[in-house]
Amino acid sequence: METSSNSSGSSSSPPSQHQQQQQQNSQLNLSSQSCFSNNSSSAADFNNYMESKLSEENNYYKNFNSNLDRGDSFKLEKESIKDTIKDNIKEDKICNDNNNSSSSSSSSSSGNNNNNIKDGRAPSPITTQQISPNKLILNTTKAITKPTPILNTQQTPTTTATTNTSTSTTNSTPSKFKKIKNSTINPTIEFISKPSLSVMFGFSPIYFVESIFIVLLIYILSNFVLKETSVYVISIFVIYFVIYFDNRYQIINKLSKSSINDSDSSSNNNNNNNNTTTTNNDSASTKGNNNNEISSPETYQKDVKSKINFYEHVNISSTNLNNVNTTSNTPITNPSNVNQPSNITTATTATTTSTNNNNNVNNSINNNNNNNNNNNNNNNNNNNNNNNNNNNNNNNNNNNNGNNNGNNNGNNNNILSKENSTNSLLNNLILNNTSVGKTHNRSSSGSDSIQPPPLPTGGSSHNIFYSAFPTHPYTDIDQSSTYRTRTFGSSSINNRKSLPPEYYNQYLNFLAHSNNNNNNNNSNTNNNNNNQSVSAPVSQLATPVYQTPGTNSVVGNLENDNENNNDSFSDINDNNSVVGNDFEQDDQILQNNGISTTTSTIVPTNDETKQELSQLENSNKVRSTVSKFIKLSTGVEEKLDWAIAQQCTLQPPRSSHSVTVYGSSLVLIGGEGITGENLVQFIDVERNLFISPKVTGGKVGPESIYNHDYCRIGNKFYLFGGYVAGKLSNKLYVLTIMDDSTVHWSSPRISGGCIPSPRYGHTFTRYGNRFLLFGGYDGEQCLNDLYILEPETMCWSTVTNIKGGQTPSERFGHTSTILGEKLIIFGGKGINNNNNNNNNNNNNNNNNNNNNNNNNNNNNKGLVELNDTHILLLNEIDSSFQWQVASFHQVSEIPSERSFHSATRVGRNIVMVGGKKDDSNGNPIALRDCWVLSYRMQWSKVSGVQFSPPRYNFGLIKNGSKLFILGGKGNNNNINNNSSSGGNNSSSSSGNSNTIITNTTNTTNNNNNNNNNNNNNNNNNNNNNNNNNNNNNNNNNNNNNNNNLSILDDIWFVNTVTLPISSSVTMINYSDIKIDKEIGKGHFSKVLKGNWKGKDVAVKKLNSNKDKAREEMIQEFKAEVELLGSLQHPNLVTCYGYSLNPMCIVMEFLPSGNLFELIHSKPSEQQQSIKLDSTLILAIAFDIARGMQHLHTRNIIHRDLKSSNLLMDKHFNIKIADLGIARETSFTQTMTTIGTVAWTAPEILRHESYNQKADVYSYAIVLYELLTGEEPYQGIPPMNAGILVASKGLRPELPDNCDPNWKKLVVWCWSEDPNKRPSFEEITNYLTKTF
């Protein structure tokens, strides 16, 4: 059975291209001659015939396999025929004209080998004479004489390498492992990955594996990585993205499963070696014998045509890309001398810019967000301006001031804003005299393939990718994971799987058709250079547009010049590079370029396209979701309802004063126009009491003082700077509170000669036992110097040991607040180093208007309000400092520019309120918005009922759980004109728009900007006149506003602690509570999280006690509930009610955890700033002492006071919990040991009688935890520690560097003799007078 390589009936030389085409067409012919045509037999007869033939084939192969010992001829025959019958469609092999004609490639079978069935007759056995030379060249020395029927496609594919001289074959008998693989492993894998199961039954084994992965990932993130973040937040993100990528995998697998696998096995077989072909059939996908079920000819023909259509576009056309019309895909005869007509556009261009610097090019930008300017440069001097207007509204209706078609002429030829970067929705790509071909064409891997032109770079810091279909606005997605974001010139193009082009074609046709419906009001923009205006149809834009939730705020380097019209790109880079990288406002870019962001109601016919479009629509919701979860993860209250103290007002009114807390009273010092006995005043807001204390040392004290700042240590207040008796001062005054009716003034002697200059508007902040002075205004210039005052030695010193960082610019009227080991400085009025004036943000050639802007923005000697945040890192170890500029998340808002606002600490957060901002004429505009800066450096705007009127130079202080605003300066008559409501960020008088929150830009006068943006309009004179009138009106309003400003006397407050729903405890039906999950469990009870009346609650469900009768248990339970219900205090956990069946107590839910977790949690790299500082330690100590004082006034002993029973709310207010074992004093004289050993008093451990002083001992142990951050008796077993405490007087060891005032209090509280321990009333007084 040997024969030569030419004995197979085929010519040794390859056939012509025409013959190859005929042979392939004969294999793919599914026309009227197919087995289901009108002239053929029925499908049932044909199936019967095929079954009989298949049984004959099986019998033949049984005999064939049994006769394998006859020689290698059968092996060669089987291997050769297996390779030859693997039918490959036309797309498996398309060679370029320059490729070697003798090269060949392998083919892979997908299971259906009946392509040669004609006229209803069974196919004749295939011999090597029937195989095209292009499909297989047999260079063997053995002949095949016996014709062989069609092989069963379930046989294992093998790998064969054929050459001109020899052929190496492998044993075709499947090994034991291959049999197991074919019979067990492959069906199992196919069953697991089969997506139809999840559709039919809602579940498949792959989802079980994913579920385990999700649970494990959430556990790792919540326990080791993101300890401070709620597990619910992590769960939502993990589940969302896992399901999202799984759905994407299902879409890609469904669309490209039948075609992509075939292309992978044959795309790399096109080599230029001499007559050498390597065939790898292991990667071919054989999925069983499909001869028993043959699809209808229409279905199969449609599938074949779709495959052919896909692989026709795999190799790029031989036509040069520079000479191709992208609309019709036809060559351009003379591209070098032809200007681009209107039907030539780039596939990804939605907002394009001019790049020809040799010509005088004027780029026009429509300020009404209705035009999309596409400037295509040619070799000629003429410029084409393509205006694509996708808005249904008339352009004349989009500007309130009547500036309808204002043009902005700039010297820069390439106008790119931050949003036109690589991460934006639109890629700015223009190639001179070049138009890109179809978006789904891919370059061939052959040696003569045409490489696409290089991409223009967008700057040194940006890697621009070719994103023809940038459906995802986020850059976290791998740029090489999909076809849509691949780079030009990639070396792995042939090996990468890709979505079929028909999917993209349907998607683009859908978008183009959708956009074309809105193309009703296209207009041309007139250039001053009389350039030709060409209107390009929207249908040619092959860039998808997605819809996002509407928003009027602009995040990034954009300015909003009008409240209802965001119409100006503000930042232009002179060297034609992208300025920034803000991905959040891609929809804003579309609006600014005239592209409609509203999706059409047209429904695509392709199911996969529908599913993908739904995925894209869902991805747009991630922006708002991320912003919401960021705010939730910070633990910041987003709503505060301010209320006015009805019966209490300041007498007299005050502004520019200082306010502090002493005990339960508020202390007011100084103020503008305040003199005499009212210079110092005590206020009790709840009881409406005003006390002017007796002043001693009055001759030393100031006659009047305002615009100063102070620091406090105990009962001493250190005041520096400001106006004293109407003059700027640099003198230091000390006010000592002797008691509630007496204060004493003194002026200490300063040692050394380094004394700060006189100033006002500075900040004076306490850090440890030192005072930090920063900034101010000395009457001539702003300052940014930094001083330190040692109160013990009264010595000033300048800070010189700053390790690095950028020092904040000179400023005054700012705020400085200690947050951990950081000094946070925000806002103020001074010199803006980043943008000295806003002319740098305007693209305008009109020098007169530039001068007008310069004059308006540089009022008050060139000083402007600021909204930057700077951080001074404080290191107590080496007393070194380092400046940093705070960076915030891109999707977050930040407060607008302001000065003379107020800020204070609330837990681990900073609350900032109010302030002022000068308008273009220098008139102050008061603000009233409220913001919170978390310890994670995340700003959050607080909603709720706002105080009124807006104000600045007021006092802000936290007393207990309440925030107070006292006095200030504002407009008390025209509230509506001066204040904003709801979500407005700032307020202004009539005619001025609200300030827009941006990250890096400063707002400018809106009317002046509109004036500048309308210089190229035919109605220029009229617009200028209108703007001048507006300016005059604004000036008049502002002057009136300035005249109406007055000193205020009102007091506003807000409670930061959740108030109880009702004043008394009521019985609650257990069915009314929606139980969520179990959050804790103990020996006597378990705690469940639930919801009652729309409020999160904690349900403490008691376990049944078999030793007690039910009636006895109910009586004790009711007594405990009544006791808890009567204890309404801000520092005690609120009890809402109870239920008898089952027995449970409903209490408020506190999700922030307990004090033990806060102190002893191991800080990660991201949590270094969470360290407890002296301010927070003092606040926590005060809260515990106040809560326990309230318990003891009711003759109640807690008996289990420890850090794990001290819960915290969102503002880190302490709530004393676990009062279940608390008893009245008369019932606890002889009870046995209760509580935790480390926090239990020694008299209880000795089983002696005890009283309220046992809780004082526990309080001392909690203070030890706060001061040291360590657990008590660490390393000693609890039982041994209890014995040593009870018998040997063991106590935890305080470190040597502990503050002596704190050490004194701790030692006092854990005295061995209970009678020597202080009461909680004495503790609160000690804290007030000492710290």
Curated annotation (Swiss-Prot):
Q: Which PROSITE patterns match?
A: PROTEIN_KINASE_ATP, PROTEIN_KINASE_DOM, PROTEIN_KINASE_ST
Catalytic-site annotation from UniProt: 1200 (proton acceptor)
TM region positions = 201-221, 224-244
Residues reported to bind ATP: 1079-1087, 1100
One function term, GO molecular function aspect: protein serine/threonine kinase activity
**Family annotation (SUPFAM superfamilies):** Kelch motif, Protein kinase-like (PK-like)
Protein's UniProt name: Probable serine/threonine-protein kinase DDB_G0272254
Q: Which organism is it from?
A: Dictyostelium discoideum (Social amoeba)
